[in-house]
């Protein structure tokens, strides 16, 4: 179905940003990131969501690490050697830039109208009414 393909494309685009956000909150290993992503996306659409798998996440983590956005350090969890990820300074700058862009989007009347229409939700109607007066 076209709608499923479009939704998958949208979630794939957000996955990198969400991974950075998750890592910004705590040093976390790949499996922990997968669990957080499952929690994040399943709350959006539990009946349509397929669990995150390692074949999707670890290539993203390797790419982010290779480009210097995150760094991995080996540690032990449950008697297993695991790699814990954290943001580098470059990663923190990138995430801050994403936050700034996101703040700009959600404060844009056109984007806000789009989000409200697509979600049947009046997210900031009171705030927007106050800004207009």
Where are these regions (language model features)?
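Basic, amphipathic "hinge/linker" alpha-helix immediately C-terminal to the N-terminal HTH DNA-binding motif
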Residues: 81-99
């Amino acid at each position: 179905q076209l709608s499923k393909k479009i939704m998958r494309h949208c979630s794939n685009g957000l996955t990198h940003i969400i991974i950075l956000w998750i890592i910004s909150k705590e040093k976390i290993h790949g499996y922990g990131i997968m669990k957080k992503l499952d929690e994040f996306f399943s709350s959006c659409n539990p009946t349509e969501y397929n669990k995150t798998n390692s074949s999707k996440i670890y290539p993203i983590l390797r790419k982010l690490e290779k480009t210097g956005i995150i760094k991995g350090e080996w540690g032990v969890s449950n008697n297993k050697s695991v790699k814990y990820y954290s943001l580098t300074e470059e990663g923190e700058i990138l995430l801050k830039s994403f936050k700034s862009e996101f703040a700009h989007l959600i404060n844009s009347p056109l984007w806000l109208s789009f989000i409200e229409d697509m979600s049947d939700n009046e997210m900031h109607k009171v705030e927007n009414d106050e800004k207009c007066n």
